[in-house]
């Protein structure tokens, strides 16, 4: 039986687990499999880069090769996991080199979450973007730069679908960068899931002072091409020109691999207090995990916690367990910083 630890996913959860594990175990072979380049960057920086004038490449804090060398990890970048055999403790992965099988002692799923896609009509519906990775940000950045370089074009304009955490952060960032921002949300106030009404009202006022326009109790009906730009039709019938349409309506745990392997999945991959899934020797953490350590009134399987601090706590506990010291995950009160410089906020998760 293989003695290797395999981590699937090179986001904060995957790399932090590798780093914490290496503090405790310097000899066990570690493989990290990722569909992207594996470069390490702070995902929260994606929603405050425009105002700082930072280019996509400047958001990478450590190249993947350097991370792998520092942590003595075998990196399999641009490689997709096609299947997991829980009985044989193997996974099939495919890269440009072809298909290969990897055996594991323990497997960690850090597959993250995927942006929720809201169906809209129109011939430019596929132009609606979500920013859930550095690659997504690079495409969005290029689109706005193209608009800025077009002679005679008016001020760049972005329509954001969703007034939640990510929507408000991007609205603040883009407005500070000189972009005209309009936010459309079916609810009645910004950050309704995290803030009481008084705080929501204060945030709305602060963002409006930057020029952000809100359309509450409203949705996007269609997105069409129009004279080199996009034309957004709201449910009210109003049409709004835009250089880009950004969907920020939320994330859904990426559970496809886990479901195909027969693991227990609810809103995310269900894990116990030791972060073990329903299969022996397979663990999960990060945005793809549903933690028994975070009780919920909505599910007997606990809660998802798609924030930075829970990931750090989970990675430390899991690393200890993987290194031979079973450690139950205990969450303390963890603040969530809302990156809206117009009105800086910290919310208890």
Predicted regions located by residue number:
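A conserved beta-strand/loop element that lines the FAD pocket in flavoprotein oxidoreductases
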Residues: 70-85, 208-220
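Conserved beta-strand-loop-beta-strand element in the redox core of flavoprotein oxidoreductases
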Residues: 85-101, 224-239
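Glycine-rich dinucleotide-binding loop and its adjacent helix/turn
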Residues: 111-177
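Beta1-alpha1 glycine-rich phosphate/pyrophosphate-binding loop at the start
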Residues: 2-73, 172-194
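Mid-to-C-terminal Rossmann-like scaffold of FAD/NAD(P)H-dependent oxidoreductases
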Residues: 2, 288-349
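Short hydrophobic core segments
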Residues: 8, 102-112, 240-250, 315
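Rossmann-like dinucleotide-binding cores of NAD(P)H-dependent redox enzymes
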Residues: 60, 155-159, 165-222, 310, ...
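FAD-site-proximal beta/loop scaffold in flavoenzymes
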Residues: 126-148, 233, 238-313
């Amino acid at each position: 039986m293989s003695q290797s630890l395999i981590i699937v996913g090179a986001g904060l959860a995957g790399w932090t687990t590798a780093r914490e594990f290496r503090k405790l175990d310097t000899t066990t072979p570690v493989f990290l499999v990722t569909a992207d380049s594996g470069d390490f960057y702070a995902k929260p920086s994606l929603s405050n880069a425009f105002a700082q004038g930072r280019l996509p490449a400047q958001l990478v804090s450590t190249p993947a090769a350097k991370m792998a060398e520092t942590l003595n990890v075998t990196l399999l970048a641009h490689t997709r996991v096609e299947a997991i055999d829980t009985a044989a403790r193997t996974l099939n992965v495919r890269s440009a080199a072809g298909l290969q099988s990897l055996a594991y002692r323990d497997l960690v799923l850090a597959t993250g979450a995927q942006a929720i896609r809201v169906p809209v009509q129109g011939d430019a519906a596929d132009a609606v973007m979500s920013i859930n990775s550095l690659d997504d940000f690079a495409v969005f950045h290029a689109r706005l730069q193209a608009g800025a370089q077009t002679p005679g074009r008016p001020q760049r304009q972005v329509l954001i679908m969703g007034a939640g955490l990510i929507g408000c952060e991007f609205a603040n960032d883009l407005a500070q960068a000189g972009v005209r921002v309009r936010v459309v949300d079916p609810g009645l106030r910004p950050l309704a899931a995290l803030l009481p009404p008084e705080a929501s009202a204060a945030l709305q006022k602060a963002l409006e002072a930057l020029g952000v326009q809100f359309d509450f109790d409203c949705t996007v009906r269609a997105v069409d091409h129009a004279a080199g730009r996009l034309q957004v039709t709201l449910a009210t019938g109003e049409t709004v020109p835009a250089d880009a349409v950004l969907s920020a309506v939320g994330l859904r745990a990426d559970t496809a691999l886990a479901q195909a392997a027969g693991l227990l999945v609810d809103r995310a991959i269900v894990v116990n207090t030791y972060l073990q899934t329903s299969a022996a020797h397979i663990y999960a953490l990060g945005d793809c995990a549903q933690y028994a350590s975070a009780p919920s009134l909505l599910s007997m399987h606990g809660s998802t916690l798609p924030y930075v601090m829970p990931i750090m706590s989970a990675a430390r506990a899991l690393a200890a367990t993987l290194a031979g010291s079973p450690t139950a995950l205990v969450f303390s009160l963890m603040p969530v910083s809302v990156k809206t410089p117009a009105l800086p906020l910290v919310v208890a998760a």
